[in-house]
UniProtKB/Swiss-Prot annotation:
SMART domains: AAA (SM00382)
Protein family membership: Belongs to the archaeal ATPase family.
InterPro entries found in the cross-reference section: AAA+_ATPase, Archaeal_ATPase_domain, ATPase_dom, MJ1010-like_2nd, P-loop_NTPase, WH-like_DNA-bd_sf
Name used for this protein in its record: Uncharacterized ATP-binding protein MJECL26
Source species, domain of life: Archaea
Record: residues binding ATP: G33, P34, K35, S36, S37, G38, K39, S40
Keyword Cell inner membrane among record annotations: no
Keywords on record: ATP-binding, Nucleotide-binding, Plasmid
Sample GO molecular function, one term: ATP binding
PANTHER family: AAA+ ATPASE DOMAIN-CONTAINING PROTEIN (PTHR37096:SF1), YALI0E33429P (PTHR37096)
């Protein structure tokens, strides 16, 4: 799949993030959005497009780790070297850096203050060279359950460090990517971060964009009009294109996708201890509309069902705009089919 295709018309997002990286650091930026909406892809593109600028990117991708341990965190973030920062070997094609740490440094007896001192040293080394450091952490919520000696939560302490690096000292941008919206909810309500964070939504692809891509890929007007009622995520487009090459009709592909999501959702409901009726009641809010307002349409007793559906990535909760919707339009159709089958 060509580079150009993936980025078809993410201009608005690209421009926002590129500009953001070039402004003076003043807050932590949380980039959030439904699963697979293309957050990492856009971010990597930003890094690529700014590779000849005076920005040094520290980019850490935690999606590869189920639940990283303390040691994994240290090995991911630091590299033994006589330099204060060096190229990240895990991301060679991106040309991003990681923090350097002395050869004789003992990872086992590291306290959080040492960790933060090292991060500070690396960032200051970049600034002293007249360059701008930008720290990007993809799937930051994976660090949630890491504790250092004295039971200190790594994530909470990191937030304090990030506030200091951005809002207080204006040294370094910190950009955190996540599709875990309950995590964004926690952050949104976290007092440390109250006036120190901003949020940016990377949502479904716009319909006009999808139409242009499919047109360019040689789909007929009829196929495009059919597909537009169902597509919302970048990877769906590339799969649809591949399936067409393999001889599957647009309709067949989309029906298959809906069935897969429907079976997955049914299995989820059948295997949970939560009350089935409660779950179906919440799902039936989406029978005739694709999004609901958290304020106006959610009762307290429905919260546990909603939380369960959000945790399992059936629903997406846009905390900042106060709306809840399925994670994709395909998921919405799966929900509607399940609701209709119940009646």
């Amino acid at each position: 799949m060509g580079e150009i295709m993936k980025f078809y018309d993410r201009e608005k997002e690209l421009n926002y993030l590129k500009t953001y990286c070039q402004l003076e650091p003043n807050s932590i930026l949380f980039v959030y959005g439904p699963k697979s909406s293309g957050k990492s892809t856009v971010m990597r593109r930003v890094i690529k497009e700014l590779e000849n600028s005076n920005i040094v990117f520290f980019y850490y991708n935690l999606r590869k780790y189920a639940t990283p341990t303390r040691d994994e965190f240290l090995r991911v973030f630091f590299e033994k070297s006589d330099k204060k920062y060096l190229l990240n070997k895990l991301e060679l094609n991106l040309g991003v850096c990681k923090f350097g740490i002395e050869e004789n440094f003992d990872f086992n007896n590291l306290c959080l203050n040492d960790v933060f001192a090292k991060i500070n040293e690396s960032i200051n080394a970049v600034v002293e060279e007249g360059k701008k450091p930008v720290l990007i952490i993809d799937e930051l919520q994976k660090l949630k359950n890491i504790y250092f000696n004295g039971g200190k939560s790594l994530l909470n302490e990191l937030f304090n460090l990030f506030v200091s690096l951005t809002k207080m000292e204006h040294l370094c941008h910190v950009i955190c990517l996540t599709s875990d919206t309950l995590f964004i909810d926690e952050i949104y309500r976290n007092s440390t971060l109250k006036n120190a964070s901003e949020y940016y939504l990377i949502d479904w692809l716009r319909k006009g964009t999808i139409r242009n891509i499919l047109k360019e890929e040689g789909f007929s007007e009829e196929e495009i009009n059919y597909a537009l009622d169902y597509l919302s995520l970048p990877y769906e487009i590339s799969q649809l294109i591949n399936n067409k090459k393999l001889g599957l009709s647009v309709e067949q592909t989309i029906k298959q996708w809906i069935n897969v999501e429907k079976d997955g959702l049914k299995y989820l409901i059948d295997t949970t201890d939560l009350d089935e009726e409660g779950l179906y009641n919440v799902l039936s809010k989406f029978k005739d509309k694709i999004k609901i307002s958290y304020d106006k349409e959610v009762k307290k007793e429905e919260m546990k069902y909603l939380k369960f559906l959000i945790e399992n990535e059936i629903l997406f909760y846009d905390v900042i705009n106060g709306i809840i919707k399925p994670t994709s339009i395909i998921e919405w159709h799966a929900i509607k089919e399940i609701i209709n089958a119940m009646q």
